[in-house]
């Protein structure tokens, strides 16, 4: 509502960032595209909840790796692979190209300001990406002792899906089950911290 070009917001310990323009609220997976686009042949790690647009776009000029949800998991993976960057949808951004590979929202702000100063138009770049429709996280309450069994049962069921089930292109099981279809994907994973199944669809 004010005469501002951008807004930056942080969580309590400033390891997550939200970046807002006058038109959009950019999630971590979209910011991963913007930042990695300015790195030379980047390797980028994303979590299983990240948009397929992120993976497809980054693979067109670098290498995208899908990994488990959880910022502690990404910290381990970025050290293991020496990737240039990692991101979670929630706004944990890890710069490892010119920084130390941990999630620092103040540093992410400086990198965003660097792009803005160079004339990078976040809104135009976002509008040039394929338009997709993504749900937020949808949580299903189960029990602590059944959540992982449900995931294992789902993996088995998907080996022989019903005849009227949409055509499956790929099944990724690095963290729960992410099923890739011709025109979208669905994810079901067990929460790390609560007796819930976490789902997301695009």
Q: What are these regions, as identified by a protein language model?
A:
Residues 1-19:
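N-terminal small/polar loop signature for handling phosphorylated ligands or for N-terminal nucleophile
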Residues 11-14, 31, 89-90:
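Short, solvent-exposed loop/turn segments at the edges of secondary structure
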Residues 11-12, 21-23, 181-183, 192:
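Short acidic-glycine loop/turn motifs at beta-strand connectors
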Residues 15-33, 54:
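Short Gly/Thr/Asp-enriched flexible loops that form oxyanion-binding sites at enzyme active sites
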Residues 33-41:
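A conserved helix-loop-strand patch within extracytoplasmic ligand-binding domains
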Residues 41-200:
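Phosphate-binding and adjacent anionic-ligand microenvironments
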